[in-house]
């Protein structure tokens, strides 16, 4: 006989499973978003920490030292996910939802050595939704994560070889997660909504130790969020609070000019997802610990290589390939977005309309490797009385466009 969770079980379940079990996002491992630069995405972000594009400052603020005049760059990414779950005893369901992810950058030199920059990005996000009456409804129906990160930065060119950069991150984080309170058809939802603001920093350096070669290293700090919100079930609405720390990220990039037309690039990226180990969840009124949440993530890695070729002074083509190690495995993979390891294939094009205006276009395909297993059984901290097992399939297409503009005069009359 299958045990059917009551509403009281759903209160515990929504906290244990949904409250900050923020599902993995196929775009960048865990619930991170890597789509921050159309030029970078055209080569699977190979070499971004060692590059020149303004949007590469997301990975390394020292990139700003390459800016020679006031610049702005806007990026738009459209995400088309094909993500399915095939439960052992039910029909296959599609849970992917498309999304639009924008980013904006600006920078202006203060003098021959210092450059001031600013970025508005969305480092974390998620949008998945399963059908109302699916086999795993008590473990997840709808998942939404939204973030905005404001990042003022300053770079300093020490000499012709070394540049450094530093920045301040102010980040808003919001989540909305739902799951059924019972296994019966049309069971009502339990819903968690919570948000918070956290502060962090970023650092970086670029070295140009030999002709045509650049090495870049960037660091984005972890950011602690005190999330406050409400848990709503058929029994009513209660205050809820929990702490979540988004992971630190380190990006190492290299670029080498082979001649006037050819360049090769590479990236190694590490994300400290393993710091999301056990998350205590609190009653928002009494402050007592309701439970602890073992996310059990491991650190994520990305390895990518790419190349660029200048067809002319106006047109540059690029391509790249990457391999990503996801932060979850067959034990910790979740129904909200079941992410396996992935191969990333990218291609892109830049068209310089004029000396001041450049258009970047890119397309990226993330291909999940194998059918990732999702298993929730007795003894699992997520278990709500109903054993669940499924295999998953993931295939995500991202189309990116970017517009770069340079200006001879600075805004506000600055000289």
Residue ranges and their predicted role:
Residues 2-14:
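Bacterial N-terminal signal peptides that target proteins for export
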Residues 48-70, 106-113, 125:
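Outer-membrane beta-barrel pore proteins
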Residues 27-44, 85-93, 98-415:
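Outer-membrane beta-barrel porins/channels
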Residues 8-11, 59, 259, 307:
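Residue-level micro-sites within transmembrane alpha helices that shape
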Residues 32-47, 65-82:
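Transmembrane beta-strand segments of Gram-negative outer membrane beta-barrel proteins
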């Amino acid at each position: 006989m299958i045990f059917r969770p009551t509403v009281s079980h759903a209160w515990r379940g929504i906290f244990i499973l949904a409250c900050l079990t923020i599902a993995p996002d196929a775009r960048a491992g865990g619930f991170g978003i890597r789509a921050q630069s159309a030029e970078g995405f055209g080569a699977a972000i190979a070499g971004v920490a060692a590059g020149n594009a303004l949007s590469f400052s997301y990975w390394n603020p020292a990139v700003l030292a390459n800016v020679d005049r006031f610049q702005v760059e806007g990026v738009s990414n459209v995400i088309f996910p094909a993500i399915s779950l095939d439960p052992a005893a039910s029909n296959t369901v599609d849970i992917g939802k498309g999304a639009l992810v924008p980013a904006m950058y600006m920078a202006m030199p203060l003098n021959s050595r210092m450059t001031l920059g600013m970025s508005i990005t969305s480092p974390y996000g998620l949008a998945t939704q399963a059908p109302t009456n699916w086999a795993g409804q008590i473990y997840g129906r709808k998942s939404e994560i939204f973030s905005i990160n404001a990042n003022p930065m300053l770079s300093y060119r020490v000499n012709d070889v070394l540049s450094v950069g530093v920045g301040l991150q102010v980040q808003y984080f919001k989540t909305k997660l739902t799951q059924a309170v019972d296994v019966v058809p049309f069971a009502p939802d339990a819903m968690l909504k919570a948000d918070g603001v956290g502060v962090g920093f970023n650092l970086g350096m670029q070295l140009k130790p030999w002709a045509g070669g650049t090495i870049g290293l960037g660091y984005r700090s972890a950011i602690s969020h005190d999330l406050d919100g409400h848990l709503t079930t058929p029994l009513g609405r209660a205050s809820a609070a929990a702490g979540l720390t988004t992971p630190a990220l380190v990006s190492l990039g290299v670029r080498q000019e082979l001649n006037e037309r050819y360049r090769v690039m590479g990236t190694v990226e590490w994300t400290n997802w393993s710091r999301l180990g056990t998350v205590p969840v609190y009653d928002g009124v009494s402050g007592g610990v309701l439970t602890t949440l073992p996310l059990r993530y491991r650190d994520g890695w990305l390895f990518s290589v790419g190349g660029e070729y200048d067809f002319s002074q106006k047109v540059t083509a690029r391509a790249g390939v990457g391999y990503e190690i996801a932060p979850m495995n067959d034990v910790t993979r979740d129904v909200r977005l079941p992410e396996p390891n992935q191969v990333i294939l990218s291609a892109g094009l830049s068209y310089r309309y004029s000396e001041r205006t450049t258009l970047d276009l890119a397309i990226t395909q993330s291909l999940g490797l194998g059918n990732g297993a999702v298993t929730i059984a007795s003894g699992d901290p997520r278990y709500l009385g109903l054993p669940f097992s499924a295999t998953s399939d993931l295939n995500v297409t991202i189309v990116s466009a970017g517009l770069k503009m340079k200006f001879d005069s600075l805004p506000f009359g600055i000289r």
